[in-house]
Amino acid sequence: DTLIIGAGAAGLMAAIQCAQRGQSVTLLEKMDRPGRKLLITGKGRCNVTNCCTIEEFMPNVLSNPRFLYSCLNALNPYEVMGFFEECGVPLKVERGERVFPVSDRSADIVQALVDKARQLSCRLIYGCADALLIGEERVEGVSLTDGQKLYAHSVIVATGGKSYPATGSTGDGY
């Protein structure tokens, strides 16, 4: 049903959401493991979210608050916290209402996302994505490094931006 390209935070969450809605999901990551950029967030501790209402948070948004407002309404900070706690990652709130895993390990957040995706029968494939296959006006699939091509009814491109090239980010799909 759904092919997701990129196994960072957005790709993993998209895989989980699609699988929870009954779709079969294949998640492809060009690197050898998922969440490499996520591992360095919050100085390796992963600032998961902020523990405040949308109304408290919005005055701190400097650019494009309308876009962010709709995103936060779709999955607010308290729902994010509940999700990770249901996945077995206890959280704590620190100065500035920043939320971190109690362990102070971003790897625990990545592992929780991977475990949840696998629990929902998502197929995760690492180190193989090569290029997007673009048909008429849409992405139809991806070619793999071994020459194989995967197609899907729905394709989500979650390849991230160009920041932190040391993590493997090249801006593919940006």
Give residue spans per PLM region.
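Predominantly flavin-linked oxidoreductase catalytic cores and closely associated redox partners
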Residues: I40, A107-Y174
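Structural motif
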Residues: T2-L3, S24-T26, K37-L38, R45-C46, ...
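N-terminal Rossmann-like FAD-binding beta1-loop-alpha1 element of flavoenzymes
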Residues: D1-L27
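Cofactor-binding loop segments of dinucleotide-utilizing enzymes, especially the Rossmann-like FAD-
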Residues: A7, K30, G160
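Conserved N-terminal/central alpha/beta ligand/cofactor-binding core
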Residues: K30-R123, C128
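Gly/Ser/Thr-rich beta-alpha loop segments that engage phosphate groups in nucleotides
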Residues: G8-M13, K37, K43-C46, K162-S163
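Hydrophobic/aromatic ligand-binding patch that stacks against planar heteroaromatic rings
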Residues: M13, Q17, K30, L38, ...
